[in-house]
Amino acid sequence: MSRIANKPIVIPNGVEVKVEGNVLKVKGPLGELKQDFLPYVKVEINGNEMNVKPNVDYMKRRSDLKKMKMFTGTYWRLFNNMVIGVTKGFKKELEIVGIGYRAQLQGKKLVMNLGYAHPVEMEIPSDVKVEVPSPNKIIVSGIDKQRVGQVAADIRKWREPNVYSGKGIRYVGEVVRLKEGKKA
């Protein structure tokens, strides 16, 4: 059973939440997000609080309640991330480690030199903002936590940290365990 869904989600001032059928829409100062949800879940809005509960109208047998409670925890977390996203936003920072490895923005493209024979070009999605404050640092930010994390993971995938030398793209604060090389 999900116990996190027992807590209500606090809706801050300036954030508007609407439920239209099986779609939750959250509008705030940074933008607007919407999320579809299954009919197993019931969303109730009371003033500045939102509750996510299992929808017992869809329960056919007793074992369905376990599945419904599982979904309430998942959707509680998704809806909470939406409220945080439209108020504060999300940010992931990446650092590039390696001699000659660097990144730069060229219009709507992120161009990275990562030791390959050619520079790697990556199209930046419109719902995510990418900044390059220095050639060795990339900041990915946006209001949708899933999109920010996915774009950061896609950038990191171009050159994951090498387990022997540590060179590559890593998240800021990520600890890369280095293996010992061959002994002669």
UniProtKB/Swiss-Prot annotation:
Pfam families: Ribosomal_L6 (PF00347). GO terms for biological process: cytoplasmic translation. GO terms for cellular component: cytosolic large ribosomal subunit. Keywords: Ribonucleoprotein, Ribosomal protein, RNA-binding, rRNA-binding. InterPro entries: Ribosomal_uL6-like (IPR000702), Ribosomal_uL6-like_a/b-dom_sf (IPR036789), Ribosomal_uL6_a/b-dom (IPR020040), Ribosomal_uL6_bac-type (IPR019906). Gene3D superfamilies: Ribosomal protein L6, alpha-beta domain. GO terms for molecular function: rRNA binding; structural constituent of ribosome. Belongs to the universal ribosomal protein uL6 family. This protein binds to the 23S rRNA, and is important in its secondary structure. It is located near the subunit interface in the base of the L7/L12 stalk, and near the tRNA binding site of the peptidyltransferase center. Part of the 50S ribosomal subunit. This is Large ribosomal subunit protein uL6. It comes from Thermosipho africanus (strain TCF52B). The gene is rplF.
